[in-house]
Structures are given as C-alpha cells and as structure tokens.
C-alpha cells in the first residue's frame, strides 16, 4: 500500500507537487503512486505547469527523465520545474551554479519570452525573435537563435550552452555580445561564459564543464 508521501497544491504559477521520496521503498513505488494520483483527474493537468519539490539527491538522471517523459507524454503538462526540498543541497547544475531549474520541452517561438530566476533548460529549438532570461544558466538541447541573457540577476558565473549556439544577442550578467556578421556557424555544441570582462565562446568539453 502506498504511503501518503505525495501532496498536490495549487499556486499562482500552476501546481506544486511535494514528494517525500523517503516515504516509498524505491523510485518505482513512488512513480506508481504519483501516476495513480494524477490519473484521478488526468484532463485537469493538461497545459499546467508542475513544480515538483522533492529530495533530488535520491533521484538519478535516468529516473528524472522517465518521470518527465510520463508527465509530458501522458498528462500533457506545459512545463516541469524541479526544486530540491533542501535548497542548500540542490545539485541540479553542480560546479557552475546550484539552484532551481525550469524545464521546457518545446520550441520557443518568435515573440515568446521566457523568464526564470534559476536555470532554464530547453529541450527544443529557440527561434529568432524569442527571448530567454535566466538568473542562472541557460542550456538548450537544440538550436539557439533567439536573444538570451544568463545570470540576469548579476551572476557572472552563469553559462549559456547549446547544441548549436547561434543567438542574435548573447548576454551574461552585464556583459553583452552580438552575433558576428559572417556565415560561419559551427555544427558542434558550444558554451559561452565570462572570462575577465569579455564573453568567450568555446566548444563544449565534458572534462571542463560539469553541467
């Protein structure tokens, strides 16, 4: 029998799901309980933003992806935000910036503006004419061609990374860079960061960036 380890509350941003992962014997038991709870009002969650607060250190990356896939594919939620129940131990982006993360699994289209106080992770493209503002890092698993501002609250340790980094305007903290006029567009992942007073862009290396 499932323990009462999942609470769902409404807030102005959407729905907050509080999961006490330690109330369950393992991740699969928690997932079964979560699905059963959501299934009671499945259509209610369509288009909603879910903020999931739990002990992130107890959930590995594979299970996090599994949970997100179910929420997006079966319940058709709009956004999914993971938040550590112990913010001081949040390990979402260990080594560069630790904090809350907003996940978007869609294309950000022209005219759309995304703002968040923590990290922003986008699984999809960011089209020209769109704008991304993050207090932490901006990570795009796709082509980034819009305007992007990481470290918007002054965090000069923030980075911007994408599979194809082609923004019109790129800003980290209070430093701004514009796209070059030439047509040379690398076809490999790149990372932008501050070095001194300038923004530098370099190929992504897993040995150098722990993201």
Swiss-Prot record:
Record has Transport as a keyword: no
Family annotation (InterPro entries): CAP/MinC_C, MinC, MinC_C_sf, MinC_N_1, Septum_form_inhib_MinC_C
Keyword DNA repair: no
SUPFAM superfamilies linked to this entry: Cell-division inhibitor MinC, C-terminal domain
GO biological process terms held by the UniProt record: cell morphogenesis; division septum assembly; regulation of cell septum assembly
Superkingdom classification of source: Bacteria
Keywords: Cell cycle, Cell division, Septation
Pfam families found in the cross-reference section: MinC_C (PF03775), MinC_N_1 (PF22642)
Family under the similarity heading: Belongs to the MinC family.
Subunit structure: Interacts with MinD and FtsZ.
Functional description taken from the UniProt entry: Cell division inhibitor that blocks the formation of polar Z ring septums. Rapidly oscillates between the poles of the cell to destabilize FtsZ filaments that have formed before they mature into polar Z rings. Prevents FtsZ polymerization.
HAMAP family the record matches: MinC (MF_00267)
UniProt name for this protein: Probable septum site-determining protein MinC
Provenance organism: Clostridium acetobutylicum (strain ATCC 824 / DSM 792 / JCM 1419 / IAM 19013 / LMG 5710 / NBRC 13948 / NRRL B-527 / VKM B-1787 / 2291 / W)
Gene that this sequence comes from: minC
């Amino acid at each position: 029998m499932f323990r009462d380890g999942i609470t769902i509350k409404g807030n102005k941003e959407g729905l907050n799901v509080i999961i006490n992962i330690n109330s369950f014997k393992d991740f699969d038991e928690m997932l079964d309980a979560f699905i059963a709870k959501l299934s009671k009002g499945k259509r209610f969650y369509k288009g909603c933003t879910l903020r999931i607060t739990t002990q992130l250190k107890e959930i590995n990356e594979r299970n996090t992806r599994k949970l997100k896939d179910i929420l997006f594919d079966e319940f058709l939620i709009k956004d999914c935000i993971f938040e550590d129940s112990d913010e001081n131990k949040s390990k979402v982006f260990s080594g560069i910036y630790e904090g809350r993360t907003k996940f978007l699994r869609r294309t950000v289209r022209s005219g759309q503006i995304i703002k968040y106080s923590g990290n922003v992770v986008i699984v999809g493209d960011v089209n020209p004419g769109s704008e991304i503002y993050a207090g932490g890092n901006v990570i795009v698993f796709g082509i980034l061609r819009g305007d992007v501002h990481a470290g918007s609250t002054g965090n000069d340790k923030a980075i911007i990374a994408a599979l194809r980094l082609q923004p019109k305007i790129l800003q980290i903290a209070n430093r701004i860079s514009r796209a070059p006029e030439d047509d040379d567009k690398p076809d490999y992942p790149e990372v932008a960061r501050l070095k001194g007073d300038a923004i530098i862009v370099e190929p992504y290396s897993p040995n150098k960036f722990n993201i």
